[in-house]
Amino acid sequence: MSKAPLALLSVSNKSNIVEFAQGLIKAGFGLLSTGGTFRLLTEHNVAVTEVSDYTGFPEMMDGRVKTLHPKIHGGILGRRGTDDAVMSEHAIERIDLVVVNLYPFAETIARSDVTMNDAIENIDIGGPTMVRSAAKNHAHVGIVTDPADYTRVLEALGDGTTLTHALRYDLAVKAFEHTAQYDGMIANFLGSRVNENQEPEDFSRTFNVQLEKVQDLRYGENPHQKAAFYVENNALKSKQASIATAKQLQGKALSYNNIADTDAALECVKAFSTPACVIVKHANPCGVAVDTDQVAAYRTAFSTDPESSFGGIIAFNRPLTLAAAKAIIDNQFVEVIIAPSIEDGVLEATASKKNVRVLVCGDLPAPELRDRQLDYKRVNGGLLVQEQDLGLITANDLKIVTDVQPTEAQIADLLFSWNVAKYVKSNAIVYAKGQRTIGVGAGQMSRVNSARIAAIKAEHAGLATEGAVMASDAFFPFRDGIDNAAEVGIAAIIQPGGSMRDDETIAAANEHGIAMVFTGMRHFRH
């Protein structure tokens, strides 16, 4: 057998593969390669042997069969010191390094015009087989599936051809993760088309998702619970701003509750196309305001519920200004501030409060352009999966059901309060006026009690509910919610409608001279 160990290179993602191949030759490897990878390397004058020349067996079936040969898999799977005689008998040389990444199945199925045949032809067979073979035999073989690992592999090799067992093991685990994700995507795609016409269905027969641990957390919701933060692989690659892709610039490590609350704040502020500030406590908005002056937006949001805002999470949908950062730091204790970006000087302004976590998430999409993701909720023994609630309501969608017509200003406030109510835990009631929250009632078992709490919050903050609007995330089952609204001076109401007693609530609104509109869309949040 050859004294020089072999490295086999067969990649779909050809980023930096030429440089990596040159580095492997310098380290002492002989190279084998296939198809497009072989052509690219030879075009750059890299000394490489085509796999078909090595095996004596040609590529066939339009490339479907290239590496499925005993000389390849024997060279990868052979146990050094155990299988040497068999390998020698059959002229199988050892392959000590396998560099493979797979056909672009994810990119293929992401196309709007993808056909079943396109998908099938982009299911890699030889690639995963080599990856799994090399990963299984990691005691002797290195497996590289990610171009991001090329540099560390070359650095680890130095002037030799041997990787440490620790590195081979790490690369092997990464390889199995890679093939697991790949097979999961295939199962999801094909499993959502298990019907007579192979038409796509909303949810696949099995549900496969891969998450990557990005952080061990001190504890979970409570100190006696262990916790970690995992991120979806597609989220890591996505350009959509999220807590999963946000970058922390300052402060202590995020806690479990910080992450959950920051997610709630960021998702709420995304709902507004105009400059907005959202303050969240325990996953509920406690103050929201829209204003082109960011300092004013913050101060107004804070004034809705100063007590609850203490130790809260603050989110903006525009770059954080130096003035707003100073206003926050000078005014309150805050756990997290998140914005698309920050102005020069912000970190210097927040440095006096070194524990404050400052995060940037990148530009936010317009509300109507947000990618629809899936939401998961674990129940004992199972997982509930649904589309993310990105339902939008405009003025044109509103159905006026009362004698009194809402004014243009009231319609603007109704839509504002509706956007907030969507992110408040059910039963949710939001009072608003002048594009700012007046009071928020969250999480009550009775809708009318949420309304009462919103009024109490407003009174406690010294904010007048007279002439304000009210949003309800679901319909009013009885007229008591309307009667209560009249008692505190509510002038207009927005709700989904759809109750068997809608006639009673409409009659109540008419009795009190309140304008009321139906959206036809519910926003339960549990």
Curated annotation (Swiss-Prot):
GO cellular component annotations of the record: cytosol
Catalytic activity: (6R)-10-formyltetrahydrofolate + 5-amino-1-(5-phospho-beta-D-ribosyl)imidazole-4-carboxamide = 5-formamido-1-(5-phospho-D-ribosyl)imidazole-4-carboxamide + (6S)-5,6,7,8-tetrahydrofolate; IMP + H2O = 5-formamido-1-(5-phospho-D-ribosyl)imidazole-4-carboxamide
Highest rank taxon of the organism: Bacteria
Keywords: Hydrolase, Multifunctional enzyme, Purine biosynthesis, Transferase
EC number: 2.1.2.3, 3.5.4.10
Pathway recorded for this protein: Purine metabolism; IMP biosynthesis via de novo pathway; 5-formamido-1-(5-phospho-D-ribosyl)imidazole-4-carboxamide from 5-amino-1-(5-phospho-D-ribosyl)imidazole-4-carboxamide (10-formyl THF route): step 1/1; Purine metabolism; IMP biosynthesis via de novo pathway; IMP from 5-formamido-1-(5-phospho-D-ribosyl)imidazole-4-carboxamide: step 1/1
A Pfam family annotated for this UniProt entry: MGS
Record-annotated MGS-like domain positions: 1-145
GO biological process: 'de novo' IMP biosynthetic process
Family listed: Belongs to the PurH family.
Domain comment quoted from the record: The IMP cyclohydrolase activity resides in the N-terminal region.
Classification via NCBIfam families: PRK00881.1, purH
Record's protein name: Bifunctional purine biosynthesis protein PurH
Underlying gene: purH
